[in-house]
């Protein structure tokens, strides 16, 4: 058992680590999951400017991906529908309707100009062997964009999940400029479906947002949905509307879906229902309003971390500075190499060093003559000469030597020198250089992705307030049943599913219940009505206690525990204590009492004014009308 436990612990840890690191959670550096990175790298290697069959791209990616083609296909379609890095041709499905993409053999794709310009740089990319060792794949792409926040990846791993909401490219880049300038930033999500968003609880990517469909009235009887909430399709929205209609939460006449590249759902309402009351009901009971939580989890170094939007932007901005610096230094080193060789080439031709090899007998002698001949002009070198430089000089063809143009060569060197000085200047002002690069991307590509989601503040739609009071309740005194499926003649009321009903029975007991379909009420019902917990329901109560002494009180029933029985008679009813009068009249009038006969009794009856009573608690005894036992109680209307 111990060996099995150790085996399970080790294998589970390896499996969990693999799912987290190699499948479900994106890397903060390039914002990509491994399968996405392999797809983009494959497209980069295949890139010739033309479209490629998706089936072919999947096949090439399979050389790097240790899993099935379905995962590659699904990931490619998702990437393509983000529209940042993959240009589509053919039916890639519809994010608005939820329709799937066509088969891979029928659709084509290629890298977008944005991807070519910002994601790849082979000399600065770290590679690792693929799963079978036959090929190499990038450890991460040298992306210069905040891809993690742009795309909004989702993933479920062992013991954790990530759900990053997508943000607007231009706003992210502008936020990076603000960070470089030492300003505070606040970036909010932006969704391709558009819609309305209340970001009050976003909490920098650690909270949630509420999103709504954009619904506008068209006349008194029609509403049109023109934008969807994030994660909702036209099919799921229509299904939720139909479901709410079946439950009686909203009345719908007809629904017409005219969605193509833009959303257009026309909702028609029946007689008696108007747009002004129906739109809040749509937000309350359907997917026209949803809440979306955000949890940004990404691989940082060798482990997953939960981050905020500001933390991610800060990391990626620092990374961008380093990438710009690395690119400039690599470009500078390439120019210095070119300047060095052009200088050697000029000396080799202009000073006729090549003439020294005419008498050399062996390869060793040739190399020695070139080495010695070149070092005679060592003071003109851009940097020390190495043996590889000799090989390059010896590869210069005679035709090139004979056509050597000193003036052109001099201009080429001057241009290289100018470019190196420009790079040195950019490196000296790395922050300004980075800001300039970001501004260039915004100018070139920002217009392609304008903000689609409008930010606003929602007033929470209270389902109780917009619920339709279309449940008809009634009481059948012959059977004692009460509810919506009872055909009775007493206490007919119309309520909503969120209302509560107060029922008082002849024994002085009362209960507050939800609208039932059919329930048996023990005892004869004296009162039944919709109950408002804020206002309450007031009664004037007259009862006799166990000693048959009459008491009266005025009460207001407000607080309650649903379905719990309460008594208007302190101590509860018994064989002798009983409820005599229950009235809701604000001026209940007077009560006439007849006393039980007794020896030497002079007063046999009395009348008492109930209008003088003050409101007391439900459990209070009330006011004693007389200390004498009572034989009968009768209400006299004043």
Residue ranges and their predicted role:
Residues 1-206, 266:
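Catalytic phosphate-handling regions of large nucleic-acid enzymes and associated NTPases
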Residues 3-4, 153-156, 160-638:
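C-terminal interaction appendages of subunits in large macromolecular complexes
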């Amino acid at each position: 058992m111990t060996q099995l436990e150790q085996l399970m612990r080790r294998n589970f840890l390896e499996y969990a680590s693999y799912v987290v690191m190699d499948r479900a959670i994106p890397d903060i550096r390039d914002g990509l999951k491994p399968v996405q990175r392999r797809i983009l790298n494959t497209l980069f290697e295949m890139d010739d400017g033309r479209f490629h069959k998706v089936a072919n791209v999947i096949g090439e990616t399979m050389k790097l991906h240790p899993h099935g083609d379905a995962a590659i296909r699904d990931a490619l379609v998702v990437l393509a529908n983000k529209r940042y890095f993959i240009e589509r041709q053919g039916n890639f499905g519809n994010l608005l309707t939820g329709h799937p993409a066509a088969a891979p053999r029928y659709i084509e794709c290629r890298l977008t100009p944005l991807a070519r310009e910002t994601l790849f740089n082979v000399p600065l990319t770290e590679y690792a062997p693929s799963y079978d060792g036959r090929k190499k794949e990038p450890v991460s792409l040298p992306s210069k964009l905040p891809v993690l926040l742009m795309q909004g990846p989702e993933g479920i791993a062992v013991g954790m999940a990530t759900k990053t909401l997508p943000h607007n490219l231009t706003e992210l880049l502008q936020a990076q400029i603000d960070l470089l300038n030492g300003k505070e930033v606040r970036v909010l999500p932006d969704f391709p479906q558009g819609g309305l968003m209340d970001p009050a609880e976003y909490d920098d990517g650690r909270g949630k947002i509420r999103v709504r469909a954009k619904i506008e009235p068209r006349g008194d009887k029609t509403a049109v949905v023109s934008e969807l909430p994030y994660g909702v399709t036209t099919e799921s929205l229509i299904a939720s509307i139909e479901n709410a209609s079946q439950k009686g939460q909203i009345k719908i006449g007809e629904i017409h879906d005219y969605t193509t590249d833009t959303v257009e759902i026309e909702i028609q309402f029946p007689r008696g229902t108007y747009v002004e009351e129906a739109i809040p009901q749509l937000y309350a009971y359907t997917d026209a309003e949803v809440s979306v939580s955000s949890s940004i989890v990404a691989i940082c170094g060798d482990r997953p971390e939960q981050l905020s939007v500001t933390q991610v932007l800060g990391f990626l901005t620092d990374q961008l500075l380093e990438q710009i610096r690395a690119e400039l230094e690599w470009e500078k080193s390439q120019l210095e190499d070119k300047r060095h060789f052009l200088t050697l080439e000029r000396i080799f031709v202009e000073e006729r060093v090549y003439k020294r090899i005419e008498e050399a007998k062996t390869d060793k002698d040739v190399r020695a003559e070139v080495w010695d001949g070149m070092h005679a002009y060592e003071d003109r070198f851009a940097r020390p000469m190495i043996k590889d430089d000799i090989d390059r000089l010896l590869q210069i063809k005679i035709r090139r030597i004979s056509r050597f143009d000193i003036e052109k060569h001099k201009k080429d060197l001057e241009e290289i020198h100018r470019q190196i000085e420009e790079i040195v200047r950019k490196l000296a002002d790395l922050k300004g250089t980075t800001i300039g690069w970001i501004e260039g991307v915004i100018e070139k590509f920002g217009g392609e992705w304008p903000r689609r989601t409008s930010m606003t503040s929602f007033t929470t739609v209270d389902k109780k307030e917009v619920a339709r009071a279309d449940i008809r309740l009634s009481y059948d005194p012959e059977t004692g049943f009460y509810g919506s499926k009872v055909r009775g003649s007493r206490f007919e009321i119309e309520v909503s599913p969120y209302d509560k009903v107060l029922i008082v029975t002849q024994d002085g007991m009362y209960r507050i219940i939800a609208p039932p379909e059919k329930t048996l009420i023990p005892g004869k019902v004296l009162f039944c009505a919709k109950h408002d917990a804020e206002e309450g329901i007031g009664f004037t109560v007259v009862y006799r206690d166990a000693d048959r002494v009459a008491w009266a009180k005025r009460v207001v029933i407000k607080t309650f525990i649903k379905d719990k029985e309460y008594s208007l008679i302190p101590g509860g009813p018994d064989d002798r204590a009983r409820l005599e009068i229950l009235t809701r009249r604000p001026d209940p009038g007077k009560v006439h009492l007849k006393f039980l006969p007794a020896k030497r009794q002079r007063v046999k009856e009395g009348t008492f004014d109930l209008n003088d009573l003050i409101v007391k608690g439900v459990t209070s005894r009330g006011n004693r009308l007389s200390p004498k036992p009572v034989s009968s109680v009768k209400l006299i209307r004043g």
